[in-house]
């Protein structure tokens, strides 16, 4: 009988959702949906010292924003698999820890942090890989009582079998093996009885009937420890798939302190990126579709995603590629969506007031629409539209070169004259004025359009000229033409 597909994303509530975590969540979601399975969101909050009060809510908000809706979590009916928060499962873990203690597969360890550190330093000095020596592996009841009489609280360590090889098939990496002699007896419960991650995750994955564990390569070294625990309990081991590392643009392993790249989903949201683009981009970080197509909706990704097309080679986080991809989505979005992404940044930058009357809102809407084709993300609208909110023009070097050409004074003077004669000041009227200027001066093409654009915007490239001039307004354009003549 085939086991139902059940996967989980199990973040620790220590901060915002990192792009690496978002990719893991996405791969799990896509795999579950492609197979008609369940996507479980579990909160691994056993590391109480690192937990942040608002982190769980923010993690869930970021997943919802990306469109990764879960089937089971802390906000759903628990059913037979809940609760979905680790600290609400502590009594469950303690029962299983006691089982290992009773079966002599785990033991109490009384070594202090200072003793452990001294042991590690001595091993390093001898050129050995640091690992727990096993000092307290076989303490007698009298020895344990002596430690406890001194008030020393023990941790619980798992008794790792010696001289064995732990092997498993990874859906991404193929056959993987670890020698138990290099692992050392690892801690499964802290002094306060709260379990460590490697223990809690095994118990949870077993009891929640998780069929596939899909996660990042950084968890690969945890896998042999977890498999040893599965075997100690006599439980079926789930299938594993470890996606490749994500490297920064310099091909270095990403650090959360790396300022060369924006690393948290909430930051991309606040900058005005589209969630569809982030999902599309993250899917291609380590997974390759069949064919050359690069733009996929979430539904299309669900249809195409398979683990056998996930690469074990590191994925490069190409910020230019993400900007390009988001631009593709923005160009094809409806204008109201783009306005929602961009307008808050014009307000936050002080370019526009928070309260806009109907006329000013329509002007802002048209302004944003003017740059919809160019925008890579919402916040970029501030820089793109700078010329609409300044008294003086900042000329680029290219614009200065254009304005120095000999035909420019005649073109600009004639254009100013044609604008004065207009009854209206709409894009269609402005195009007529440009055409009349062409007829009067004999200039056409770049010799005609470039001086006008350079004079009114300070640039030699930009959106449709007639719309640009209309939105700048007659008085502003008149003043800029005079300044450039």
UniProtKB/Swiss-Prot annotation:
A single cellular component GO annotation: cytosol
Record carries keyword Transit peptide: no
Any GO BP: glutamyl-tRNA aminoacylation
GO molecular function (one): tRNA binding
Catalytic EC class: ligase
Main localization, broad class: cytoplasm
Cross-referenced InterPro entries: aa-tRNA-synth_I_cd-bd, aa-tRNA-synth_I_codon-bd_sub2, aa-tRNA-synth_I_CS, aa_tRNA-synth_I_cd-bd_sf, Glu-tRNA-ligase_bac/mito, Glu/Gln-tRNA-synth, Glu/Gln-tRNA-synth_Ib_cat-dom, GluQ/Sye
Catalytic activity: tRNA(Glu) + L-glutamate + ATP = L-glutamyl-tRNA(Glu) + AMP + diphosphate
Gene3D superfamilies per the UniProt record, alphabetical: 1.10.10.350, HUPs
Motif mapping: 'HIGH' region: 11-21
Motif 'KMSKS' region per UniProt: ranges: 253-257
Coiled coil location: none
Key words of the record: Aminoacyl-tRNA synthetase, ATP-binding, Cytoplasm, Ligase, Nucleotide-binding, Protein biosynthesis
Role: Catalyzes the attachment of glutamate to tRNA(Glu) in a two-step reaction: glutamate is first activated by ATP to form Glu-AMP and then transferred to the acceptor end of tRNA(Glu).
Family of the protein in this entry: Belongs to the class-I aminoacyl-tRNA synthetase family. Glutamate--tRNA ligase type 1 subfamily.
Protein name: Glutamate--tRNA ligase
Organism taxonomic ancestry: Bacteria, Bacillati, Bacillota, Bacilli, Bacillales
Name of the gene this protein is made from: gltX
């Amino acid at each position: 009988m085939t086991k139902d597909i059940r996967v989980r994303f199990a973040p620790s509530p220590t901060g915002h959702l990192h792009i690496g975590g978002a990719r893991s969540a996405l791969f799990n979601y896509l795999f579950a949906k492609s197979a008609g399975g369940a996507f479980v969101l579990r909160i691994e909050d056993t590391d109480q010292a690192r937990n942040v009060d608002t982190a769980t809510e923010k993690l869930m908000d970021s997943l919802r924003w990306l469109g990764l809706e879960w089937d089971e979590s802390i906000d759903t009916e628990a059913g037979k698999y809940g609760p979905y928060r680790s600290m609400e499962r502590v009594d469950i873990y303690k029962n299983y820890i006691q089982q290992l203690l009773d079966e002599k597969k785990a033991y109490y360890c009384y070594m202090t942090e200072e003793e452990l550190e001294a042991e590690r330093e001595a091993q390093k000095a001898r050129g050995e890989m640091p690992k727990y020596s096993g000092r307290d592996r076989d303490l007698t009841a009298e020895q344990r009582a002596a430690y406890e009489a001194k008030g020393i609280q023990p941790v619980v360590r798992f008794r790792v079998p010696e001289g064995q090889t732990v092997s498993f098939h990874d859906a991404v990496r193929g056959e993987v093996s670890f020698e138990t002699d290099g692992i050392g007896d690892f801690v499964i419960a802290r002094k306060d009885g709260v379990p460590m991650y490697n223990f809690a995750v095994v118990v949870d994955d077993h009891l929640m009937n998780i069929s596939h564990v899909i996660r990042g390569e950084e968890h690969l070294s945890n896998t042999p420890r977890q498999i040893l625990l599965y075997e100690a309990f006599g439980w079926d081991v789930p299938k594993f798939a470890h996606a490749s590392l994500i490297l920064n643009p310099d091909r270095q392993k990403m650090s959360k302190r790396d300022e060369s790249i924006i690393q948290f989903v909430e930051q991309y949201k606040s900058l005005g990126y589209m969630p569809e683009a982030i999902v599309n981009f993250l899917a291609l970080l380590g997974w390759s579709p069949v064919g050359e197509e690069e733009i996929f909706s979430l539904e299309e990704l669900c249809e195409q995603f398979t683990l056998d097309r996930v690469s074990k080679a590191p994925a490069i986080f190409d910020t230019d590629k993400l900007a390009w991809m988001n631009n593709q989505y923005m160009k094809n979005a409806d204008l109201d969506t783009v306005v929602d992404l961009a307008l808050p940044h014009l307000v936050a930058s002080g370019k526009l007031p928070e309260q806009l009357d109907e006329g000013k809102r329509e002007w802002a809407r048209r302004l944003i629409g003017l740059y919809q084709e160019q925008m890579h993300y919402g916040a970029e609208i501030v820089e793109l539209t700078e010329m609409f909110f300044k008294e003086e023009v900042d000329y680029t070097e290219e614009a200065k070169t254009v304005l120095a050409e000999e035909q420019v004074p005649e073109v600009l003077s004639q254009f100013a004259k044609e604008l004065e004669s207009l009854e209206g000041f709409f894009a269609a009227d402005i195009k007529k004025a440009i055409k009349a200027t062409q007829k009067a001066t004999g200039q056409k093409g770049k010799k005609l359009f470039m001086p006008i654009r350079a004079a009114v915007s300070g640039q030699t490239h930009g959106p449709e000229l007639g719309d640009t001039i209309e939105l700048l307004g007659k008085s502003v354009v008149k003043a800029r033409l005079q300044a450039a003549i």
